[in-house]
């Protein structure tokens, strides 16, 4: 199922990429690198187990592939996305951010923990080094961070990717795939297997998640 809740070009919304016939165990929310790359996650979702419902953030349509700064430095955009998540927070969440979308996913994850007390199961940061400002100070997140990188990608040296470790007090994993900058295409099935393994290794504690969501609405 592929549905869009966007009316105006400057709207922020969520696209439901896949919907399970029975209630899903997890929701994976994808943060693309631009407003024009959301459809990519349809092919990714087709490989995922039905226990994982996939949604993607639809950015304002004026954000293109050359507008990284609007994704990485926009507190307003992060706030708007956080507000749009409200109706989707009845299941344990994981975020998957690719390239500039990884920075934005981190910002929204930070806001989620701060405002609701409900941490993500996993924050997947793909094809992105940790911004230098993110490595200063104590860890902000408590959720697991899994960093993905392409072997030999000159734009994501592994030293910079490993710096994501400093952003969480929880577990950190680094996974490197062949394919350099385009590993997400050439290693798609391996990436999907990684997502499965990471999510299924964590038993969702619905009571704790729902308690955090209820506190937000109180």
Annotate the PLM regions.
Residues 1-218:
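Domain-scale detector for complete catalytic domains at protein termini or as standalone homologs
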């Amino acid at each position: 199922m592929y549905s869009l809740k966007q009316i105006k070009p400057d709207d922020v919304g969520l696209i439901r990429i896949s919907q399970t016939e029975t209630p899903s165990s997890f929701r994976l929310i994808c943060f693309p690198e631009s407003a024009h790359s959301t459809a990519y996650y349809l092919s990714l979702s087709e490989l995922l187990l039905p226990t994982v419902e996939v949604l993607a953030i639809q950015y304002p349509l004026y954000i293109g592939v050359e507008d990284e700064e609007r994704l990485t430095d926009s507190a307003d955009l992060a706030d708007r996305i956080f507000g749009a998540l409200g109706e989707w927070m009845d299941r344990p969440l994981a975020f998957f951010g690719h390239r500039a979308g990884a920075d934005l996913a981190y910002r929204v994850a930070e806001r989620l923990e701060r405002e609701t007390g409900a941490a993500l199961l996993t924050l997947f940061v793909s094809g992105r080094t940790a911004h230098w400002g993110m490595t200063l100070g104590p860890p902000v997140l408590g959720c697991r961070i899994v960093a993905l990188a392409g072997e030999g990608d000159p734009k994501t040296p592994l030293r910079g990717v490993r710096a994501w470790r400093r952003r969480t007090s929880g577990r950190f994993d680094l996974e490197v795939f062949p394919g350099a900058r385009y590993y997400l295409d050439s290693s798609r099935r391996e990436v999907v297997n990684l997502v499965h393994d990471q999510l299924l290794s964590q038993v969702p504690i619905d009571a704790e998640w729902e308690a955090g969501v209820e506190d937000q609405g109180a």
